[in-house]
Amino acid sequence: MARILIVDDSRTSRKILRGILEGAGHEIVAEAVDGLDGVNKFKEFSPQVVTMDITMPIMDGLEALKNIREDDKDAKVIMVTAAGQQNKMIDAIKLGAAEFVTKPFEPDEITKMVGKLAES
């Protein structure tokens, strides 16, 4: 079981991720609605794994990832984004993202990623 922070501006996406991950036995410690909120909640809750959307208001996922990795070089962040954003995914990997997944994704795809990262 992993302690997870979900960062996504879409309420629907957060709800779907919560359902999938809780259904797999993981604990959602917090949800954040933008990158800045995500950085703050990362510091507050110290999750084992973060799922992070890339395109968000106030602070996008790439900037939030950069901030989180500056605070914790071992942070395990899975970037979640829409199809057609391959360049941003490459940027995310360069910034230290542990994994990435493209929407829509299969539930077992994200649960396997979270499980692998939680064990590492």
Regions found by a protein language model. Give the residues of each.
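Two-component/phosphorelay signaling modules centered on CheY-like receiver
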Residues: 11-30
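Short, conserved "switch-loop" micro-motifs in signal-transduction and mechanochemical regulators
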Residues: 83-84
